Every structure is written in C-alpha cells, then in structure tokens.
C-alpha cells in the first residue's frame, strides 16, 4: 500500500512539473513547444524570403518566428543558443517592413501586428534578425538578400 501511494504521488509530481512547459502540445519531432506554439531553429543559412517559404512548408501554419513578449523572446534566444552552431552574426525572424507611403509599417510574416518591440536600429531595410552580439535578444534591421540561419514557428 505504501509503495502504491509513493508511485501515485511521484506521478502526480511529474505531471505537475510538466504542466505549462508545453509537454502536452502536439509538436513535430525535433520541434520545441512554448505557449501553444512549436518552434525550430534551422542552421542552414537562407535569404529571408526563402526562409519564410521554407517555414510554411515545414508545418501547417508555419512562418518565420514572431516574437510577442519578453518571455517568448527569452525562449527563442535560448532555442537559438542551443541549436544554431554556425558563426553567423544574425538569425532571421519574421518581421518585415511594408513600405506604404507615406509610412513604413512593420508586420510579422504570420500576419500578426507588432505588439512587443526590441529594435536596435532605424527601419532603413525591410527585414529583421536577432543579433548574436546581444545573445539573440535584440532585433536588427537587415538586408533581405543576405543568408542567415532562421527560426520557424507554428501553432501547436
């Protein structure tokens, strides 16, 4: 009887420790779960548009990563640090400038609006990446034609 209670309590502790970590999300193999989304960092450098197209082909609803909070930014930075091994100075995210006269409007490639911002430079180019020098925590305005690793995000 004592062993049975110990096992039940042990299983309950494991279940509670996993709740909220994304362990219950249905992500593809080798993808990481966070807040009802799946993420994967890809080490193969691509141009921003090619990386976006690649992400849409990897998972239903997939796009280059959109970052909507400080907590998500920390998660993505950790994911990149653990999975990107190239010496690239930047990693693509899904933020693009959409030039509509007389303004420049930034949007995520998944269509969502920008509600959290962490930009280090003026918006003079059309694409954005996370900068290695800031441990992938700051957004940097980049030329879309450059080749960098990237992170994809899809609904879980």
UniProtKB/Swiss-Prot annotation:
It comes from the Eukaryota. Its main location: secreted. Residues 34-153 form the C-type lectin domain. InterPro entries: C-type_lectin-like, C-type_lectin-like/link_sf, C-type_lectin/snaclec_domain, C-type_lectin_CS, CTDL_fold. Keywords: Disulfide bond, Glycoprotein, Hemostasis impairing toxin, Secreted, Signal, Toxin. GO terms for molecular function: toxin activity. Pfam families: Lectin_C. Expressed by the venom gland. Heterodimer; disulfide-linked. Shows greater sequence similarity to the alpha than beta subunits compared to other heterodimer snaclecs. Belongs to the snaclec family. This is Snaclec A14. It comes from Macrovipera lebetinus. The lineage of its organism: Eukaryota, Metazoa, Chordata, Craniata, Vertebrata.
